[in-house]
Amino acid sequence: MLFRSIGEGDIGQFFPNTDPRWKGAPSRIFLEEAARQVALRKGRIVNVDASLIAQAPKLMPHVQGMKANIASALGLDPKKVGIKATTNEKMGFIGREEGIAAMAVASVDLPE
C-alpha cells in the first residue's frame, strides 16, 4: 500500500518473491524501505491501520507489540498505528485454521 501511494508498483517490484534474499526476511525490512521511498519523494506517512483475521493463533496478546514495531519501522507515534484482530467465526479457510488474512490502509501526505 505504501509503494502504491507514491505511484510505484507493489511490494514485489522492490522485493521479488523469486529472489532468495527475501525468503524468511523480517517484515521490518520491507516497512523501512517503504517509509524510505515515501521520504525520498518528500512524503509523510500520516497513519496506518490494519485488520488481522485469524482463527488461530489468538493475536490480541501481540497487538501492542505489533503496533510498537510498526510505529518504530515507519517513524510514527504508536498512536498513529491502528491494529485490530478478529476471528472469522470458524467460517471458511480462516475458520478452519488453514490461513490468515490481513488488510491495511495508510494515509500519506505528498507534495504536489
Q: What label would you give each PLM region?
A:
Residues 96-112:
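C-terminal edge-of-domain segments
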